[in-house]
């Protein structure tokens, strides 16, 4: 008989991105959509952003992260993953709530793209004005 592997789940959202995150005790490997995080995300700054919950809780290298993410662009996806990791860490140990909350990692960022209005070229950009 095998023991069930301990795993913590968290769902993160940002803009139009949704990330389903699973934390498994391990060496600190991060896999996004079955690819290594360095292969999936093009910028080092996004990877640093994504690791912020581990830095705040001082758990870097304690968990392997398995992520399924869809929707949005690279930045939205990275921040959705960060949100999901923070929620999963909270499930792993409720003691982390204070430090994660102070760092603003548990709050869902509500900012979304503003819709285009009729008669305008974009959300707020109006057509070019011609005096004559």
From Swiss-Prot:
Pfam family, one: Ribosomal_S9
Keyword annotations of the record: Ribonucleoprotein, Ribosomal protein
GO biological process: translation
Source organism superkingdom: Bacteria
Biased composition (Basic residues): 113-132
Stored NCBIfam families: PRK00132.1
UniProt family annotation: Belongs to the universal ribosomal protein uS9 family.
Record protein name field: Small ribosomal subunit protein uS9
């Amino acid at each position: 008989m095998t023991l069930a592997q301990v795993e913590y789940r968290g769902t993160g959202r940002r803009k139009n991105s949704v990330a389903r995150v699973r934390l498994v005790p391990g060496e600190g490997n991060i896999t996004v959509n079955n690819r290594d995080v360095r292969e999936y995300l093009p910028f080092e700054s996004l990877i640093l952003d994504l690791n912020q919950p581990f830095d705040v809780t001082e758990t870097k290298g304690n968990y392997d992260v398995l992520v399924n993410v869809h929707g949005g662009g690279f930045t939205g996806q990275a921040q959705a993953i960060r949100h999901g990791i923070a929620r999963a860490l909270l499930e792993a140990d409720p003691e982390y709530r204070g430090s994660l909350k102070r760092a603003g990692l548990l709050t869902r960022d509500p900012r979304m793209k503003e819709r285009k209005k009729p008669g305008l070229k974009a959300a707020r950009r109006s057509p070019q004005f011609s005096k004559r």
